[in-house]
């Protein structure tokens, strides 16, 4: 794969591929991915997210950087009337999601962009997404890389545009530097409202927010994840 974003120097992710894939995952990249894949949108292109799915869906949710796919597959399996779209440039993560999708039988309400999420966000209509997730994103800890963090001045307006009024934006991280960064930028953004009323609101997930493998590893290593929920304020 090549970088789809016009300026590859501004990419928000690291490597494209890690360890060699097992045979089944390699086969799923060849057989299942073509059925679920969203082609990288071209500049100026518009995509109706509801039209991506073979059956009508009541809502469309978006996960940016779905990792190995556990959260996304869970949401698809537990919300069969919702179309779940995910963007992930790391091919091993895409292969992991495909295995879960095949095992759960949720091909009809999952669609995948195996690439940078930003061209997709730019192609979506206003108020077309009912919920968005950015969970355990790369913290880019070095100061010179902070502008690569997905949640920030460049992408919050993108999310605000595509999210419906009252839609939820869910963020999570075990890196306190990134948590502070996300809070600082999202709380200051005029289109988002933080829903927390006390510490328990950001220390615990709700029942419809499943744990991920990364989260479990973080807890085992002694790190405490933080869970943030924001609402897209009504327009006008």
Indicate where each model-derived feature is located.
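S-adenosyl-L-methionine
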Residues: 1-62, 70-77
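SAM cofactor-binding core of SAM-dependent methyltransferases
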Residues: 59-122
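A short acidic, Gly/Pro-enriched loop at the edge of an enzyme's catalytic core
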Residues: 122-131, 136
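Class I S-adenosylmethionine-dependent transferase superfamily signal
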Residues: 132, 159-160, 169, 182
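Conserved class I S-adenosyl-L-methionine
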Residues: 145, 172-189
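A short glycine-rich, Lys/Arg-flanked "PGG" loop and its adjoining helix->strand segment in the class I
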Residues: 151-165
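Conserved beta-strand signature within the Rossmann-like core of class I S-adenosyl-L-methionine
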Residues: 165-173
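Class I S-adenosyl-L-methionine
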Residues: 184-236
